[in-house]
Amino acid sequence: MGLFDKLAGWLGLKKKEVNVLCLGLDNSGKTTIINQLKPSNAQAQDIVPTIGFSIEKFKTSSLSFTVFDMSGQGRYRNLWEHYYKEGQAIIFVIDSGDKLRMVVAKEELDTLLNHPDIKHRRIPLLFFANKMDLRDALSAVKVSQLLCLENIKDKPWHICASDAVKGEGLLEGVDWLQDQIRAMKT
């Protein structure tokens, strides 16, 4: 670590690093959301389904995020739990237009919340009710009701309506997450 890094750390100017898990069913928009949060010169032009997981980084005014973009395909979801201990926050993405798989999303969320590495931690949960641009998309309120988010009493959580392709609703969510993480670190 160089002199400038040490000085910045002492003065509180160095960005705090935080590990975030990005979870949700396949085709919910996880990778597209993460891509939109990166600087425009670092964004991928083509988004392909994630196999296993990928690691992406982006920064806000006060935090440096390392995001574990976990595949939502059924055969890879069992990998999620291997990263729970490392996560300091969770982004859970839901396809608001996929009413048929809302039950599966709820089952995966319940499994996550009841896992020993998550259950007793006060870890912030950010939900993106994604694909709001679709004509028959469920509202964020309806998604919240179907996932029974009101039953989450021991963790801070927030849900945002989003359109990952256009980037709508993403900054609101990341701002909330940043505030939660900063509050935990003080």
From Swiss-Prot:
Residues reported in the UniProt entry to bind Mg(2+): T50
Bilayer topology annotation: Peripheral membrane protein
Gene Ontology biological process terms from the UniProt entry: cilium assembly; determination of left/right symmetry; gastrulation; intracellular protein transport; Kupffer's vesicle development; melanosome transport; pectoral fin development; protein localization to cilium
Superkingdom of source: Eukaryota
Positions bound to GTP: 24-31, 50, 69-73, 130-133, 164
Keywords: Cell membrane, Cell projection, Cilium, Cilium biogenesis/degradation, Cytoplasm, Cytoskeleton, GTP-binding, Lipoprotein, Magnesium, Membrane, Metal-binding, Myristate, Nucleotide-binding, Sensory transduction, Vision
Subcellular location: Cell projection, Cilium membrane; Cytoplasm, Cytoskeleton, Cilium axoneme; Cytoplasm, Cytoskeleton, Cilium basal body
Record-linked CDD domains: Arl6
GO molecular function: GTP binding; GTPase activity; metal ion binding
Lipid-carrying residues in chain (N-myristoyl glycine): G2
InterPro entries for this protein: Arl6, P-loop_NTPase, Small_GTP-bd, Small_GTPase_ARF, Small_GTPase_ARF/SAR
Keyword set includes Manganese: no
Pfam family name, one: Arf
UniProt tissue specificity: Expressed in brain, heart and eye. Isoform 2 is expressed only in the retina.
Gene3D superfamilies, alphabetized: P-loop containing nucleotide triphosphate hydrolases
Traits of the deletion mutant: Results in the cardinal features of Bardet-Biedl syndrome in zebrafish, including defects to the ciliated Kupffer's vesicle and delayed retrograde melanosome transport. Isoform 2 defects does not result in Kupffer vesicle or melanosome transport defects, but rather leads to impaired visual function and mislocalization of the photopigment green cone opsin. Isoform 2, but not isoform 1, is sufficient to rescue both the vision defect as well as green opsin localization in the retina.
GO cellular component: axoneme; ciliary membrane; cytoplasm
Similarity comment text for this entry: Belongs to the small GTPase superfamily. Arf family.
PANTHER family attached to this UniProt entry: ADP RIBOSYLATION FACTOR-RELATED (PTHR11711)
UniProt function note: Probably involved in membrane protein trafficking at the base of the ciliary organelle. May function in cilia biogenesis. Isoform 2 is required for proper retinal function and organization.
NCBIfam families linked to this entry: small_GTP
Name this protein carries in UniProt: ADP-ribosylation factor-like protein 6
Organismal lineage: Eukaryota, Metazoa, Chordata, Craniata, Vertebrata
Gene: arl6
